[in-house]
Swiss-Prot record:
Name of the protein in question: Peptidase T
Coiled-coil blocks: none
Molecular function in Gene Ontology: metallopeptidase activity; tripeptide aminopeptidase activity; zinc ion binding
Entry keyword set: Aminopeptidase, Cytoplasm, Hydrolase, Metal-binding, Metalloprotease, Protease, Zinc
One GO cellular component term: cytosol
Principal cellular location given in the protein's record: cytoplasm
Keyword Zinc: yes
Catalytic residue list: 81, 176
Cofactor binding summary note: Binds 2 Zn(2+) ions per subunit.
PANTHER family reported in the protein's UniProt record: PEPTIDASE T
Cofactor dependence: Zn(2+)
Amino acid sequence: MKQELIERFTRYVKIDTQSNEESHTVPTTPGQIEFGKLLVEELKEIGLTEVTMDDNGYVMATLPANTDKDVPVIGFLAHLDTATDFTGKNVKPQIHENFDGNAITLNEELNVVLTPEQFPELPSYKGHTIITTDGTTLLGADDKAGLTEIMVAMNYLVHNPQIKHGKIRVAFTPDEEIGRGPAHFDVEAFGASFAYTMDGGPLGGLEYESFNAAGAKLTFNGTNTHPGTAKNKMRNATKLAMEFNGYLPVEEAPEYTEGYEGFYHLLSLNGDVEQSKAYYIIRDFDRENFEARKHNVENIVKQMQEKYGQDAVVLEMNDQYYNMLEKIEPVREIVDIAYEAMKSLNIEPNIHPIRGGTDGSQLSYMGLPTPNIFTGGENYHGKFEYVSVDVMEKAVQVIVEIARRFEEQA
């Protein structure tokens, strides 16, 4: 199993599937289509049925039941795309067997070193096989680790028919990283009673609470004149953007928050004197606090418009997803089964809120309750990203055990 995980994962991450926030196609990048087509062929090779890929790039497949019991249909999902935060082109995965727990030089030429000082969890992977980047790209373990685990688990169940299970549906979705994953997901066609996203992090992660999330795009319009004669004429759009940011609470940013604390995050700022554009994400677990944060942004914009003119600041703000806890609580047994599956495999479940979102956040509100399970990755979205193959193997075992337990309890 370990070799299959390594072979599939290292092959998958070499395919550039970064999504693109600026694109309006579905999926937003051709790499996701290419990857989806490959997975369709490999799902068929494994022996799954009803393998489809629709016009929007959503891949679905079925592992038929091998029991006569009336077992609910379970889904397992992962996403095709990788993050936009750092380059995902020309990924060169580096395999470190029997890791010694010490610093790893990822790139000697660029002096990129993965150290326990910067990443204290690193020594806990001593003895594991870990896969890192070469220091020039992200790895793409988010979410190609989860995707690989689903593929390997399905292959394992096909070749071990003594493990009884109900019908299992698999889906791989595009554009999760930019919040559009479930936008065109056909819940009815998928046909599962509930599902699990394999999109978590370290060993034991079991998550069924997510942020309420919104995105805010602000356009600041200035007036550019020669700086030598600019008095009472110039309006600097970049300074307007700085002023807006200054109104937000400094301590309510990602770098100062944890646990159940929400934040405002300036994701990007580009521009000049004439025009500047800022993109923020707004996050909070509590719905009332979430709404209050959005109102705060609107109020700041209103104040600035009163001060500088209506056209000085233009706000576009949209909700992205909501806390899935509300939809999962009524079917709590799907969390309990996953919890029991982990315990039976000597994995200590680590239940904590997702300081982010998964496809499950939106799918839960579309009628498909979907908690999230660990995959074994660390330091997502950057050059220090890595994954433990040993933990990936545990994730495969959890998928298999969840399927087995639902059949056993039917």
